[in-house]
Regions:
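Short, ordered beta-strand-loop transition motifs
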Residues: 113-120, 146-150, 199-207
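A conserved amphipathic terminal alpha-helix motif
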Residues: 231-280
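Hydrophobic ligand-binding cavity/cleft-lining segments
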Residues: 39-139, 143
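N-terminal chloroplast transit peptides
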Residues: 1-52
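Short beta-strand segments that buttress and anchor functional surface loops
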Residues: 124-129, 157-159, 167-168
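Beta-strand/loop substructures that line and gate deep hydrophobic ligand-binding cavities in soluble
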Residues: 166-239
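A generic structural signal for short beta-strands and their flanking turns/coil linkers
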Residues: 118-122, 136-140, 149-153, 175-181, ...
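Charge-rich (especially acidic), low-complexity segments
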Residues: 50-52, 57, 263-295
Length: 295
């Protein structure tokens, strides 16, 4: 698989931090998203690559429903861009050909934590980490969309389940995740090559390409009434944790992606996973201050 990266949607912008800013009662007493909240919601749906109309509609409805639920709403997000260069040999298969492979021919890249569900859908299991004193182990379901022009692919998380204590598992429906990993590539001009890369081209021919990944992850959380932390404190800790996860996973993903290309370009069609540990994360803890939980 070329890219992996509560339930899910597309990439995001920041959202209001409390339910009071997002929703208000309509004339019959139902909660609805305010104009300001709707504007922010639409901004959150503008992914790195525009989603299909079906994806956009489904995402909008899912998020709007979630944001209309009662409770204290917290939002935190992370974005990470990363790139790796790879040598495209004269006699080898090209990067464009690699990026044009159908999802059914993807390597999972990580045989330990990625499982193929069907032709374009994969299950991803992240390592366990601590969040606000609870041990969490997220399991994601992601769908891959390969662009027809060979420019890359897009991976969207469609669903998430949490395992851990009974309290953690019962809270799975209090999360909504909006996540997209956009994988692209570009040519590297000769004058932009490093000395080492230029020496490779001089001796072996070929050219260098750059594979790029831009990942955006946003998490929406309804903070339980019994939770002893404020929305602001929850969001601060959430940003800290999500940034650590994204900053570790994306570079490892690209490293394994380029290694998979090297094997495939030389004629290896086994599509076996190239390694493990891609989703193993060392997440430190940030102190979360206990305050009046009504705030």
């Amino acid at each position: 698989m070329r890219a992996m990266s509560g339930r899910a949607s597309s990439s995001t912008s920041s959202m209001p931090t409390t339910a009071a800013r997002r929703v208000k009662r309509d004339s019959v007493g139902r909660r609805r998203v305010t104009d300001r909240g709707r504007c922010r919601l639409l901004k959150s749906l503008a992914s790195i690559e525009n989603p299909t109309r079906e994806e956009s509609t489904a995402t909008s409805e899912r998020l709007e429903t979630f944001l209309s639920r009662k409770g204290r709403h917290a939002t935190f997000e992370a974005t990470r861009k990363s790139a790796r260069r790879v040598h495209q040999r004269v006699a080898g298969r090209t990067v464009r050909e690699y990026m044009s492979l159908p999802a059914s021919q993807y390597s999972t890249l990580d045989g330990e934590s990625v499982e193929r569900v069907d032709e374009d859908t994969f299950k991803v299991e992240l390592s366990e980490f601590n969040f606000l004193g609870f041990r969490l182990k997220p399991r994601l379901r992601a769908r891959v969309h390969v662009r027809d022009d060979g420019s890359g692919c897009e991976v969207r998380v469609e669903d998430m389940e949490l395992s851990g204590s009974g309290v953690v598992e019962s809270a799975s429906d209090s999360f909504e995740i909006v996540s997209v990993n956009n994988v692209t590539w570009r040519d590297i001009e000769l004058e932009a090559l490093t000395e080492v890369e230029r020496a490779v081209v001089d001796s072996e021919g070929g050219e260098f390409k750059e594979m790029m990944s831009e990942t955006r992850v946003s998490v929406y959380l309804i903070v339980p009434g019994w939770f002893p932390f404020t929305v602001k404190s929850t969001e601060r800790t959430g940003r800290f944790v999500v940034n650590q996860v994204v900053n570790q996973v994306v570079p490892k993903f690209l490293t394994q992606l380029t290694e998979d290309y090297r094997r495939w370009s030389s004629g290896d069609d086994s599509r076996a996973a190239t390694g493990g540990g891609m989703f193993d994360c060392e997440v430190g803890e940030e102190e979360c201050v206990v305050q009046d939980s009504t705030k």
